[in-house]
C-alpha cells in the first residue's frame, strides 16, 4: 500500500443535513464542506428537491462552509445534475458509481465538481480515475458488514486512486476514523455523532481546567520571588 500521508492536508466534510449541527460546528474551521444525500435529508425531515438544495446551499455558504455536495435523484440523472450545477459554483454533484452514473459524469463534463458515490469495489475507483472526477466516496462500514477483507479492498483502492480523492464515507465510530487516518487516508465524510466528538479529550479538558484555575489563583509571593531571583 502506498503511504499517502502528508501529501495534502486533512480534508473533513460534515456528513449531515442537520443545519443546527452545521451552525454549531461552523466556527471551528475544521470542515472543508458538507456532504448530503437523500437519506440524510430524510433523517433531517427534509424533502429531496432542487428547492431544498437551493435553501441548504444558501445556508451553508452563509455559515462559511466552502462547499456542499448534493446527490442526483429521480428518473433523469443528467437533467438533475444540470439543475444541481446551476445552484452555484460551490456545489459538488454526487453521482452513484454505476454505468448510468458514469454516462452522466461524462456528459456533464465537469470532473472537478463531481463525486462518484456508493463505491464498494476497486473497479469503481478505476472508473473514477478514468473519468478524472474530483472525489470518489467508498463506504467503509457497509463494506465491512458485507465482506471479511474490507480493509484489504480499501488499501487497494488507495493504491489505485492517483488523481481522484477517496472521500471515505459510512463511518460508525471514532475508532474507525482514527484507524483509517493512521493508514494514510485523509479525506472523510463525518456523520454528526463523530463530527462532534472526534476532537474531544477528557484529559485535555482536565488540563485546560487546571490552567484556568492556576490563572485565577493568588500566586505564592515567596515562591514567585524565589523563581524570579533565581
List the predicted regions and their residue ranges:
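Conserved, mostly hydrophobic/aromatic
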Residues: 37, 93, 128, 180, ...
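Glycine-rich phosphate-binding active-site loops on the catalytic face of alpha/beta enzymes
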Residues: 38-41, 134-145, 185-204
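Glycine-enriched alpha-helix->loop->beta-strand junction motifs that scaffold or abut catalytic
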Residues: 29-33, 86-91, 107-115, 130-137, ...
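C-terminal helical cap(s) of enzyme catalytic domains, especially alpha/beta-barrels
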Residues: 152-156, 197-230
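Catalytic cores of alpha/beta
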Residues: 20-28, 79-83, 104, 121-131, ...
Amino acid at each position: 500500500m502506498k503511504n499517502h500521508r502528508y501529501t495534502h492536508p486533512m480534508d473533513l466534510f460534515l456528513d449531515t443535513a442537520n443545519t443546527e449541527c452545521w451552525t454549531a460546528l461552523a466556527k471551528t474551521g475544521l470542515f472543508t464542506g458538507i456532504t448530503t444525500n437523500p437519506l440524510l435529508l430524510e433523517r433531517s425531515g427534509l424533502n429531496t428537491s432542487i428547492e431544498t438544495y437551493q435553501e441548504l446551499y444558501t445556508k451553508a455558504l452563509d455559515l462559511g462552509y466552502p462547499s456542499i455536495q448534493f446527490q442526483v435523484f429521480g428518473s433523469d440523472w443528467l437533467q438533475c445534475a444540470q439543475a444541481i450545477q446551476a445552484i452555484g459554483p460551490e456545489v459538488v454533484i454526487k453521482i452513484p458509481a454505476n454505468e448510468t452514473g458514469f454516462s452522466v459524469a461524462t456528459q456533464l463534463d465537469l470532473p472537478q465538481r463531481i463525486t462518484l458515490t456508493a463505491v464498494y469495489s476497486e473497479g469503481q475507483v478505476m472508473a473514477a480515475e478514468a473519468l478524472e472526477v474530483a472525489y470518489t466516496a467508498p463506504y467503509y462500514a457497509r463494506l465491512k458488514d458485507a465482506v471479511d477483507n474490507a480493509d484489504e479492498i480499501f488499501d487497494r483502492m488507495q493504491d489505485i486512486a492517483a488523481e481522484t480523492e477517496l472521500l471515505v464515507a459510512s463511518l460508525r465510530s471514532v475508532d474507525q476514523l482514527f484507524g483509517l487516518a493512521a493508514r494514510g487516508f485523509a479525506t472523510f465524510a463525518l456523520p454528526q455523532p463523530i463530527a462532534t466528538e472526534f476532537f474531544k479529550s477528557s484529559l485535555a479538558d482536565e488540563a485546560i481546567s487546571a490552567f484556568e484555575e492556576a490563572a485565577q489563583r493568588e500566586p505564592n509571593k515567596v515562591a514567585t520571588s524565589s523563581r524570579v531571583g533565581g
